[in-house]
Amino acid sequence: RKLLFRILGVTVCIAVIIFSLKNETFRILLAPSEWDFVTYRKIEYVMKLVVTDFHFDSFYVDLIATDLSSQFMTHLSTSLYLGLLGASPYILYELFRFVSPALYDSEKKYSIRMIAIVYLLFMLGVLMSYYVLFPISFHFLGTYSVSEKIHSTITLDSYISTFVTLTLLMGVVFQLPVISYFLGRMGIVDAKLMSYYRKHAFLIIMFVAAVITPPDLMTLILVTIPLYLLYEVSIRVVKIANKQIKTD
C-alpha cells in the first residue's frame, strides 16, 4: 500500500507541475502541427541534396474544441499522461526495490540492466514518434483533401489522442530487442532462423511502415530504417540469448 501511495504521489506531483506549465507543455505538444517544425526543415535539407527544388509548402490546420469542457479535460488528461511518463523511472525504481529482496545479487544486476534497456528503448520510441512518425502523419492527414470545397478542421481531442496512441505504439514497438531476447532465452526464436528470414522481415517491416505512414517514399524510408535496425539488433540479441542457453 505504501508503495502504491508513493508512486501515486510522485505521479500526481509531476502531473500538477506539468498542468501548471500549460503554455510550455502545449507549445511542445502542438509544435508538430506547425509548418516550420524541425522535422520538415530537416527533410527539406536532405531532399534538396537529391532534388534541388524540393520544399514543403506552408500549411495551416485549424484545431478546435467542440465541447465546453474539452480543453480543460484534454489539459487534465494530457498532464496525467505526461506525469505518468515523467514518473516512470521512479515507478520502475520502486518496483525494483519491492522485488529485489527476493533476488540474488546476480539477478539484481541483470534486472537493473534490463530495466534500463527497456526504459531507454521506450524513450527512443517516444522520440521517434514525436520527431518522425507523428509530424509526417499529421502533415499528410491534416492537409489531405478529397475536394477543394472541404476544409479540414481537427478537434484538439483527436490531435492529442492520435499523438498519445502513436507515442505508445512506437514505445512498444521499440521493445522488439527485449522481447526477442526473452523469446531467445526460452528457445522459441533462433538467431540463424531470424537471419535466414531477414529479407522476409524487411518486406514485412516495409509493409507495416507503409500502413502506419503516409504514402510517400521519404516517410516510408524514415520509418523503415529504424524499424529494420531494431530487427538487426534483435538478431544479435537473440544470438547472445541462444549462447546463454548452451552455457546454462
Feature locations, PLM:
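Membrane topogenic/interface segments and analogous intrinsically disordered interaction regions
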Residues: 1-248
